[in-house]
């Protein structure tokens, strides 16, 4: 191991010298003026200023010195960081297609090869996104039929929770319901919680998300050649291939034998129907159908499941907030009436708590964009192909927008009379052309599941721990998921 580390450092030294020589001979940047930023080191750039975890906080600290728009070097790659509500919103909403692309992130280039929805760009991304938005609308994500499926899943989750008899259970179990709702939408059926396919998919998704957030993948994305030499990407690619194997089987069993004109009953069925139509640019060929399904499985499960887990965990951490939510639910719904989407107006405190959860946890701190053309932004001219990081954490914790940004405070979303109020700086789903395609469904299912759980259960820390003992530091993963924890779920009398 010592010899291997010496060899790696030798490679880094040689590459650093090469980078220094290249910097002396490289032609000037196309942009007449970059935002200010810290001076980079040869080869490493500014990586020494960023931690391995919670890099968004390190970037926010740099913004205090260099301003809301600054340049950092991730290795040799110049990258522009946007920090704070005003500049992030201007970039995401005010620029149109010029900032709608993704930069070529090495690990996702290996996984998706430019396909799918979330890390693709250009015509393929536009076609995939338009199709997905249209299909979700046609499947009725806001209609009573989908509400019924969410409430059915809530009933199944309650049955699973009841089986523990008030004994400690893993927080991760609460993510099963949101995952199954996504699978119902994608595949047209829910899975039993003991179904081997369901169990395998959840386990693989969990492993992939942990690997994607690992230091090894961060190193691979910054120095892909070195990372490939060290085979840092192999573990995650191996797990992704296991997911693909399951998805291929699910796709094959849902492939219509002949072109049909009837409405699709699931996202996958709609994808397969689209692939049977005239598709001269192969937008919906077999490879991209699999890539789109993989994207929806990974992103559509992790984010909503982690948010529900955080919401429950924060109620255990803040029992006084939990009590106020339950008082409101008892007053408006009583013990027997299940929550419905239209109840949100009558439940302002419950709605405020859910919004505050999403603000406070900053689940996806930043997903980079890339300039599709030379662009004027914040007084600077950024050339085509510049990676740009809109730092969503800085928006959700912006001191100019939130009264107590570092505290969990549902009053951020309540006016002086206790009525729910929207906040412009509430951007957990991002904004503009890349806003989350599943935003509407996520909001509906989070409200129904959260309200349904608190209506029925008291959420308590495990024996031997008090709420003050609970550690809120996120677990290392691609998203800022909650730590592995147990809790007790006890029926309310």
From Swiss-Prot:
List the top taxonomic levels of the source: Eukaryota, Metazoa, Chordata, Craniata, Vertebrata
Where is it expressed, tissue-wise? Answer: Detected in colon, ileum, and testes.
Listed cofactors: heme
Organism field = Mus musculus
Designated name of the protein: Cytochrome P450 2W1
Q: What is its EC number?
A: 1.14.14.-
Q: What is its main location?
A: endoplasmic reticulum
Q: Which family is this protein grouped under?
A: Belongs to the cytochrome P450 family.
Q: Which gene encodes it?
A: Cyp2w1
Q: What class of enzyme is it?
A: oxidoreductase
């Amino acid at each position: 191991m010592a010899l291997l580390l010496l060899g790696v450092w030798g490679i880094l030294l040689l590459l650093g010298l090469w980078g220094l020589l290249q910097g002396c001979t490289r032609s000037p940047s196309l942009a007449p003026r970059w935002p200010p930023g810290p001076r980079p080191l040869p080869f490493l750039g500014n990586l020494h200023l960023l931690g391995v975890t919670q890099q968004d906080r390190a970037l926010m600290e740099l913004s205090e010195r260099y301003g809301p728009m600054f340049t950092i070097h991730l290795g040799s790659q110049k990258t522009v960081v946007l920090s704070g509500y005003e500049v992030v919103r201007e970039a995401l909403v005010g620029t149109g297609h010029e900032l709608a692309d993704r930069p070529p992130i090495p690990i996702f280039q290996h996984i998706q090869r430019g396909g799918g929805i979330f890390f693709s760009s250009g015509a393929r991304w536009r076609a995939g996104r338009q199709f997905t938005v249209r299909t979700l609308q046609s499947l009725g994500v806001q209609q009573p039929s989908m509400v019924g499926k969410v409430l059915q899943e809530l009933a199944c989750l309650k049955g699973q929770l009841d089986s523990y008899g008030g004994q400690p259970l893993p927080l991760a179990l609460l993510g099963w319901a949101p995952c199954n709702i996504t699978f119902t939408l994608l595949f047209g059926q829910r899975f039993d919680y003991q179904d081997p396919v369901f169990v395998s998919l959840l386990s693989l998704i969990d492993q992939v998300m942990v690997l994607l957030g690992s230091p090894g993948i961060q190193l691979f994305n910054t120095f892909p050649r070195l990372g490939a030499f060290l085979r840092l990407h192999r573990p995650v690619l191996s797990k992704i291939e296991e997911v693909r194997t399951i998805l291929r089987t699910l796709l094959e069993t849902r492939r219509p034998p002949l072109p049909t004109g009837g409405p699709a009953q699931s996202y996958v069925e709609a994808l397969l129907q689209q692939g049977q139509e005239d598709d001269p640019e192969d937008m919906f060929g077999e490879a991209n159908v699999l890539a789109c399904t993989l994207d929806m499985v990974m992103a559509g499960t992790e984010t909503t499941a982690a948010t529900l887990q955080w919401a429950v965990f924060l109620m255990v951490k803040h029992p006084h907030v939990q009590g106020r939510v339950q008082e409101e639910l008892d007053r408006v719904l009583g013990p027997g009436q299940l929550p419905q989407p239209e109840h949100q107006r009558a439940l302002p405190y419950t709605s405020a708590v859910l919004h505050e959860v999403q603000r406070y946890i900053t689940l996806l701190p930043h997903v980079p964009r890339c300039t599709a053309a030379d662009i004027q932004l914040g007084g600077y001219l950024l050339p085509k192909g510049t990676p740009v990081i809109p730092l969503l954490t800085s928006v959700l914790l912006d001191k100019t927008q939130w009264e107590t940004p570092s505290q969990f405070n549902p009053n951020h979303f309540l006016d002086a009379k206790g009525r729910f109020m929207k906040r412009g700086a509430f951007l957990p789903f991002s904004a503009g052309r890349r806003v989350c395609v599943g935003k509407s469904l996520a909001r509906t299912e989070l409200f129904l599941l959260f309200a349904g759980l608190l209506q029925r259960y008291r959420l308590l820390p495990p024996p031997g721990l008090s709420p003050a003992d609970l550690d809120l530091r996120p677990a290392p993963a691609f998203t800022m998921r909650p730590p592995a924890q147990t809790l007790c779920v006890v029926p309310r009398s």
